[in-house]
Amino acid sequence: TWGAARSQGRTHEGVDIFAPRGTPVLSTTKGVVSRIGENRLGGNIVGITGPGGVWHYYAHLDRSAENLRENSWIEAGALIGYVGNSGNAAATPPHLHYGVYTREGAVNPYPLIRQP
């Protein structure tokens, strides 16, 4: 779904990974938890700033992991939350929206995804 057209002239800056609600979401990178919160489009979100300042964005979560704290360091593979359909995904099946942003903008995150 990377690059697909969205409403209001937007493009899809990520990939959607469909999974049952509550499926654990693991970080694809080591780094600092830079954001835990909520926004209109992404719903419940977690942001991690990885090496080189690359920002990893995890959205539509049911909830973040209980022990996750902003400004804390995590390793790749750490539990960061659980699949849901929050934000503008309320009418869709549960899924994780995963986006990656460099200083130049959004990049296709698909190559960074791997099975644990």
Identify the residue ranges that each predicted region occupies:
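A generic structural signal for solvent-exposed, polar alpha-helical segments
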Residues: 8, 63-66, 103-104
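Surface-exposed, glycine-biased beta-strand/turn segments
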Residues: 1-44, 75-76, 85, 107-110
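Non-catalytic surface loops within mature trypsin-like serine protease
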Residues: 19-21, 62-63, 102, 115
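Zn2+-dependent peptidoglycan hydrolase active-site motif and core
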Residues: 27-69, 92-97
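Short acidic/polar mixed-charge low-complexity motifs
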Residues: 23, 52-55, 105-106
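Conserved, short, structured surface segments that act as functional micro-motifs
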Residues: 45-49, 72-116
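Short alpha-helical segments in extracytoplasmic peptidoglycan/chitin-binding modules
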Residues: 6, 58, 80
